[in-house]
Amino acid sequence: MFISLWEFFYGHFFRFWMKWLLRQMTGKCELQRIFDTYVGAQRTHRIENSLTYSKNKVLQKATHVVQSEVDKYVDDIMKEKNINPEKDASFKICMKMCLLQITGYKQLYLDVESVRKRPYDSDNLQHEELLMKLWNLLMPTKKLNARISKQWAEIGFQGDDPKTDFRGMGILGLINLVYFSENYTSEAHQILSRSNHPKLGYSYAIVGINLTEMAYSLLKSEALKFHLYNLVPGIPTMEHFHQFYCYLVYEFDKFWFEEEPESIMYFNLYREKFHEKIKGLLLDCNVALTLKV
């Protein structure tokens, strides 16, 4: 109750008068003061909040524009705030970068969601070729005897036909598995080997798909904003999402063996523990989680 009242008072009265007072003292609007004071994710995050909670409709809409409209909205913001480009030459550059990051994050989520919603289709030649590519990357010296085969268990699928394991994450789960195996082949082989440990083993592919869900949920909840705002000085892409997934796969394997669970039956418990660890790291405004091998 008290917190709600404070948020109402702050949003409707205190914030307005504080902004007005600071403008009179510094001769600069809130956006300019943010650019003068902060860098990296802190800067973009504060700009995003300032635009979102502004009473000015032009500023509010600026966080929802498409990439092709960014330049126009930067100019509109400068007009609304009476910012002279000759006196503040850096404002336009900084605002454009922030808007590209802010709107780019929203677009990245839509792109990832679109791929996630696409189910694995065994009648789709591209899907089938991608699945075969995964096998060949992980098992280069061993031939797959048949498309429907118990051999799939060797790389961590549950049944004879892997397509059933992609139901939750769609084709996104397979794309991530292939991306890691193709771009970090030696690490993928090492982790696959470790996943066959007699006591601490786990299903490599199933865990990989599970970590796709983790990466997706963190993106959806906006927990990846600090990470991506620090990492990408512009528009984040699917490549950056795949790279974050690779970080999760590599770090989860280390975490699992450090924790030494009694059995795979405790997977959900340790998965959630790892999830909380990652969420904690992502709260740091200076965070940039990259796979270092």
Curated annotation (Swiss-Prot):
Tissue spec: Alveolar cells (morphologically type II cells) and alveolar macrophages (at protein level). Expressed in brain, colon, heart, kidney, liver, lung, muscle, placenta, small intestine, spleen, stomach and testis. In lung it is expressed in alveolar macrophages and alveolar walls.
Residues in ELMO domain copies: 126-282
Classification via PANTHER family: ELMO DOMAIN-CONTAINING PROTEIN 2, ENGULFMENT AND CELL MOTILITY
Disulphide-bridged cysteine pairs: none
Protein name according to UniProt: ELMO domain-containing protein 2
Alphabetic keyword roster: Antiviral defense, GTPase activation
UniProt keyword Membrane present: no
